[in-house]
Amino acid sequence: MSDHDPHRPTGDISDAQAFDMPWAGQLSFGRAQTHRRVDEIDLAIVGVPYDIATTNRPGARSGPRAVREQSSLSAEFSQGLWPWDHSLFDRHRVVDYFDVGYAPGDTQAMLTNVIDHVGLLVKAGANVLTLGGDHLIAYPVLTATAAVHGPLSLIHFDAHSDTWDAGAELNHGTMFLRAARDGIIVPERSVQIGMRTPNVTHGFNVIHADRFFAIGIEETLAEIHRIVGDHRCYVTFDIDFLDPAYAPGTGTPVIGGPTTWQARQLLWGLADLDVVGADLVEVAPAYDAVTQITALAGATLAHDELYLLGLARERRQAAPR
């Protein structure tokens, strides 16, 4: 039996990253390395701790930290997150870029700073997974991503359509209509899944919750593929897509939603699409159960989204130029 203990001091700070204890060590997403050298990043995790645009209860500003904390557990499985057959860290330079700052209370500063930071990453060739924060943070991320990849298909998991027509107002319920009007996303090549609140489609393809439950996972995925096709797409996941039994810690919960198992199956089914960006938003830990099930769900689903980005990236790199 070896007497080697990997936790004994060696004088090398890299030992601090070798923890196999999920309750200790660095608080980065999946224990990814952390830096801001944009030319040395393939897959970037970016937090946007913002919740000023909420219309119900705030608290999503604490979402990125809570999701990172819960992601430490999945990082312990060196072979990768089940059921994926590989570790992202073996095939990509995965980096937690940490959070985009802004002057407290200044929404315009948040929008500008997110566009600047995500723009730097995307222009350097990285694919970005963003952790919110309320759902408005998707708007500047989409803006920066579309500036490089062109108008995008949106694959939107949510209890709300976020397409209210409020004129020039931007909040966490209006930004996708604004993005469509700005030419950032293409409604007819986009699909919204899980809606269970009143909405006007504004040209988006919508699979309401009742229809999702009626047709099931397989047909829902088939419909998503028919709509999106080979178009470059962005996956946005509001945690209130889930039923509050699985995700109570969010600002605008709506009963009658899918389970975490159904959500993961849906994300796995997108593995062959050309996903260039993604987000996980609206985790508000102040309302979470003591077991932190919402943050755990968010961390796991965000990790699945990171796999979508990695797989699509590999296919683009392998394609003939």
Please provide the spans of the model-predicted regions.
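Conserved alpha-helical scaffold segments that buttress catalytic/binding sites
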Residues: 2-321
